């Protein structure tokens, strides 16, 4: 191979490798942050669902208490 073409080939390889490395170094942290945010959103939805169930149970107990108090005579 002629030395002129070898130099062009090496420079081209350096440019391509640098672009790929920049792309991967930008892609990997972005992918990690996307996965962690999805995990946090899933956990948050579960917490909100459990709070909703807790409030439903609380309202049911409150209604049971109202029924119990309504059975007592008024003094």
Curated annotation (Swiss-Prot):
GO terms for biological process: defense response to bacterium; defense response to fungus; killing of cells of another organism. Expressed by the venom gland. Residues 1-22 form the signal peptide. It is found in: Secreted; Target cell membrane. Amphipathic and cationic peptide with an alpha-helical structure. Belongs to the non-disulfide-bridged peptide (NDBP) superfamily. Short antimicrobial peptide (group 4) family. Negative results: has no activity against Gram-negative bacteria (E.coli and P.aeruginosa). Inhibits hepatitis B virus replication in the HepG2.2.15 cell line by about 30%. Antimicrobial peptide that acts by breaking the cell wall. Is active against Gram-positive bacteria, fungi and antibiotic-resistant pathogens: S.aureus (MIC=5 ug/ml), M.luteus (MIC=5 ug/ml), B.thuringiensis (MIC=10 ug/ml), B.subtilis (MIC=10 ug/ml), C.albicans (MIC=20 ug/ml), methicillin-resistant S.aureus (MIC=5-10 ug/ml), and penicillin-resistant S.epidermidis (MIC=10 ug/ml). Also shows potent activity against antibiotic-sensitive and -resistant Acinetobacter baumannii (MIC=10-20 uM). Shows cytolytic activity against human erythrocytes. This is Antimicrobial peptide ctriporin. It comes from Chaerilus tricostatus.
